[in-house]
Amino acid sequence: PNWNKTIGELKKKRVLFISEPVAGKTNISLPPDDGKKIQILEKDSISHDLNAHNGKDVALSYQLEAYDESYYKYAALSGAAYFTCHTLVRLDSDDYVSMCELTANYITRSEEVVGDSEVFSLASADSSTGAKFNENYSEERKNFLKTNVSDNTILIIDGPLIGNQLSSRTIRLVKDLKERNVATFFVTKNSDSMLLSNEIAPKKYHSDLDWASKNLPSGHRSSFIKYKDLNAGHTEIFCYLKTYAYASPLRISFYPTIYNENKDLVKEVMDMLYFLILDDGNQNNPQVRLIRIAELFAKDIIKIANPDRQVRMSGLIPTVNQSRFGRSL
């Protein structure tokens, strides 16, 4: 009944067709930092322009690597199989060099199924197979990156630094890599975070990404913002980077030590990420070029490995949703 009314209201609001912000709009009043989860680190302006030409020079001056993964889940009555392709891509002078690793996890709540297997994993009775998979995935990613990432590298990882069950493990990985002079930056495309928008204008924006889309001009980033998880004690610095007028900004996050020790490097990396998004050239789905390449490698390898066929040949009985849709819902 409310279909036409909702569509009509959206058209009136013109939610999808916002005007491009101008730099002057971004000099807004910021709240005091005392006792807050977040702290604005650059208070001269909430918006900072990015330089793609400088970003290209930075990309050619440092050793760059990017990580992404692709996984396939097969839900059976006796458990769930997860197949993951971990991929690391390095930018060489004239080509992309990839390193890939395929892993398989079979997770079940049945002790009888696990038996004396050295590769099956037992999930507790009150948890999901997904939670156990996340633990295994985190360990796999850590081992893969610690083994394959080069020393003295800028590493770009698809996904958040803080904000999921893997926060503690991810931070430990970042610290371990830093001992080898690896600076790690995380790029998130989808985020429901309201940390910044709730401080600046409560209830005015749907999310921080909504705020960034409406307040940052194209080719700009927000100020760097320090966030502390008051429950777990984890800390990160993040900003929002907007490349195109009518596409979602990206959230860039990194561990505070990197910023404290080399602010100039962090600012150069923001220019570099901006250049690599422009270099990728997808205005409908902005992404850092190296991450895009890693994603393509990972997805293609999963397709070639054809885990669905492998599992079906093993005789596992799929769930109804697995049979109907090729996945569990």
Q: Can you describe what each PLM-predicted range is?
A:
Residues 62-72:
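Two-metal-ion RNase H-like nuclease active-site motif
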